[in-house]
Swiss-Prot record:
Heme b 1 binds at residues 100, 202. Its main location: plastid. The lineage of its organism: Eukaryota, Discoba, Euglenozoa, Euglenida, Spirocuta. Component of the cytochrome b6-f complex, which mediates electron transfer between photosystem II (PSII) and photosystem I (PSI), cyclic electron flow around PSI, and state transitions. It comes from the Eukaryota. The chain crosses the membrane at residues 32-52, 90-110, 116-136, 186-206. The keyword Metal-binding applies. Heme c binds at residue 35. HAMAP family: Cytb6_f_cytb6. It holds the Pfam family Cytochrome_B. InterPro entries: Cyt_b/b6_N, Cyt_B6_PetB, Cytb/b6-like_sf, Cytochrome_b_N_euk/bac, Di-haem_cyt_TM. Heme b 2 binds at residues 86, 187. The gene is petB. This is Cytochrome b6. Heme 1 (or BH or b566) is high-potential and absorbs at about 566 nm, and heme 2 (or BL or b562) is low-potential and absorbs at about 562 nm.
Length: 215
């Protein structure tokens, strides 16, 4: 085993990377509330894992979506547990994200030179809420259907471009298969990709600039 490690160590300098990570200075004022961002990230990882597992059985069609969710809950081994963890983790992710944003704001973590870190954080907050909106519709039950109809109908009040935005979100004039397909694509591909990208940038900036000092 040591020979395998030595082979990778010689080429990648793993120990140097580990030493750099473990030796990063942590200010003395840091407390448990500074862990909220890390908890949010952990929830995201859980979401990716459980969501990926459910894609093997979920069918994004208006006729089969609800039945496939029912199948996951009642027939798939531990399917009820996987979906329940996905739902609980989603709620926890939103809660931790809100608390994290409040903590950063109240401790002045958005001030110079961390403005871009704050901006990427707000974008991540918007993406997190978008996960909730798109995921809520995927079972395509009565609650999900009417939630989508209301949410996608909100932009209609915008002058000139309102109707265009509504049709862009729904895929047609009314809510239907095109809407479910778009929300499924957003929830399982577009939003995770954007979130992972902005998280990487967010973490790199935190790593570069360090944790903000006390007020």
């Amino acid at each position: 085993m040591s020979r395998v490690y030595d082979w990778f160590e010689e080429r990648l300098e793993i120990q140097a990377i580990a030493d750099d990570v473990s030796s990063k200075y942590v200010p003395p004022h840091v407390n448990i509330f500074y862990c909220l961002g890390g908890i949010t990230f952990t929830c995201f990882i859980i979401q990716v894992a459980t969501g990926f597992a459910m894609t093997f059985y979920y069918r994004p069609t208006v006729t089969e979506a609800f039945l496939s969710v029912k199948y996951i809950m009642n027939e798939v081994n531990f399917g009820w547990l996987i979906r329940s963890i996905h739902r609980w983790s989603a709620s926890m992710m939103v809660l931790m994200m809100i608390l994290h944003v409040c903590r950063v704001y109240l401790t002045g973590g958005f001030k110079k030179p961390r403005e871009l870190t704050w901006v990427t954080g707000i974008i991540l907050a918007i993406l997190t809420v978008s996960f909730g909106v798109t995921g809520y519709s995927l079972p395509w039950d009565q609650v999900g259907y009417w939630a989508v109809k209301i949410v996608t109908g909100v932009p209609e009040a915008i002058p000139l471009i309102g109707n265009f935005i509504v049709e862009l979100l729904r895929g047609s004039v009314s809510v239907g298969q095109s809407t479910l397909t778009r929300f499924y694509s957003l929830h399982t591909f577009v939003l995770p990709l954007l979130t992972a990208t902005f998280m990487l940038g967010h973490f790199l900036m935190i790593r570069k600039q360090g944790i903000s000092g006390p007020l």
